[in-house]
C-alpha cells in the first residue's frame, strides 16, 4: 500500500533547509580537506563497485556517502582515515575498508546490520554511519560505539551526518 504524506509549504521549506545545510557541510569539508597535511584519496569508485558494496552491506548509501565514494573513494590526512569501500578486496585486511570491516564484525562480533564502520579512534572505539537513524533528508547520523563483554554499546551521536563528521575532523586538523 502506498502512503502519501502531505507537507505544508513551511514543512517542505524546513526539509529543504536541512538538506542544503547538511550538504553544505559535506561540500565545505571536501573543499577544505586538501589543505590538511598528508591529504590522500584514492580517486573514487565506479558505480558497479558502489552498487556491489551496497548489496554486500544491505544498505543504500546516502547522497553524501555515494558522492564521497564516487569522487574520492577514501580520505586520509594526518592521524585521520575515513574508510573507503572495496567490495572485491580479498586480502583479509579490513582496516580502511568499510565493506570488509562491517562484514567481518557482523560475523565475529554481531555488529548491527545498519551500522557501517567509518573511522577508527584506535582505542577500541569506532565511528559508524547509523543507517537505522536517518535525518530528514535521508542521511545517517554518525555514532561512536565500542564493543565490550555485552556487545556493541553506543557512546554518543557525534555528528548529524557524514558531512558534519568530516568537517569536524578537517577543522580540528587545520586548527593545529
Name the predicted role of every residue range.
Residues 126-159:
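Segments surrounding the PLD/"HKD" phosphodiesterase catalytic module and close analogs
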Residues 162-165:
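Glycine-rich, aromatic-bearing surface loops/beta-hairpins
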Residues 109-112, 156-160:
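Short, amphipathic alpha-helical segments
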Residues 2-125, 173-176:
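A surface-exposed partner-binding patch
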